[in-house]
């Protein structure tokens, strides 16, 4: 029996990257999964992957910047599966730039997506979990939400907010049987990274050059992050709440971090 057998999970941004890998892993571990995403083409592809592997899932279109759509995603999960045991607030954007390089529109969009999106989906799910007497929320933070990052003023700010929102929710709802933790990934390869590769570089050469700046000599994979999310979502972390689990290849272990 899987580690999430009998559980229902709602995952925002479950159409690609860490969200997609987590949705597939959760389903493989026995959870029924609702994938909430803006890109329904990719979400449907994730759904097909899960169903082909023998899992159970569904999809719903959701822009986490809109509170009413987050409520709709929770309601749809309840209608389809009957409960909400796990919420993985994964949807987010990663713009680069210092304060001087960041436009007001980008600043507002980052906060709306990364911070308000986490707030909205949690706010919609918490009453359900309180009524159930149990629930787990996992927020996708970042190692740059713990130490800050070069040329990532808006992103680091948003993830720092997610880190403290995680701790605050954990304190507020611990006595109601609800645990709230955050995963803090370091640099993790996702397909959109390919646009940053120089034309003359092979993918292997580029990945090798990126990894040289990390203590472990490589960047992470989405599957590695998904396994850490699974730990936080499962009963294996039953005595953990309000914690930030950093999975970054040792990048934040010392006094400096990788620069871009």
Place the predicted regions along the sequence by residue.
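Conserved glycine-rich cofactor-binding loop
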Residues: 8, 15-16, 39
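Substrate-binding pocket helix/loop in short-chain dehydrogenase/reductase
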Residues: 98-99, 106-111, 210
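Active-site loop immediately N-terminal to the catalytic Tyr-X3-Lys motif
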Residues: 100, 147-153, 175-176, 217, ...
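Active-site helix of classical SDR
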Residues: 122, 158, 166
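Alpha-helical segment proximal to the catalytic Tyr-Lys
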Residues: 127, 171-175, 238
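Residue(s) in the substrate-gating loop at a strand-loop-helix junction
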Residues: 142
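Short C-terminal tail/terminal secondary-structure segment
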Residues: 230, 241-260
């Amino acid at each position: 029996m899987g580690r999430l057998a009998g559980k229902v999970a709602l995952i925002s941004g479950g159409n690609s990257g860490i969200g997609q890998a987590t949705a597939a892993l959760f389903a493989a571990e026995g959870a029924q999964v609702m994938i909430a995403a803006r890109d329904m083409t990719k979400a449907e592809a994730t759904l097909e992957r899960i169903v082909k592997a023998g899992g159970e899932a569904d999809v719903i279109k959701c822009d986490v910047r809109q509170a009413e759509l987050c409520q709709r995603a929770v309601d749809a999960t309840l209608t389809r599966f009957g409960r909400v045991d796990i919420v993985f607030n994964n949807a987010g954007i990663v713009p680069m730039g210092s304060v001087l390089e960041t436009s007001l529109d980008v600043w507002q969009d980052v906060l709306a997506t990364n911070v308000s999106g986490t707030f909205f989906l949690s706010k919609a799910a918490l009453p359900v979990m309180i009524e159930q007497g149990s629930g787990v929320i996992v927020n996708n933070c970042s190692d740059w939400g713990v130490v800050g990052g070069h040329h990532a003023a808006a992103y680091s700010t948003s993830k720092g907010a997610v880190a403290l929102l995680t701790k605050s929710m954990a304190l507020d709802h611990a006595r109601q049987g609800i645990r709230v933790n955050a995963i803090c990934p370091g640099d993790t390869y996702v397909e959109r990274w390919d646009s940053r590769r120089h034309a003359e570089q092979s993918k292997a050469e580029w990945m090798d050059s990126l990894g040289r700046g990390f203590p472990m000599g490589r960047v992470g994979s989405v599957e590695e992050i998904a396994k850490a999310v699974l730990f936080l979502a499962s009963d294996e972390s039953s005595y953990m709440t309000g914690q930030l689990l950093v999975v970054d290849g040792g990048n934040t272990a010392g006094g400096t971090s990788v620069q871009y």
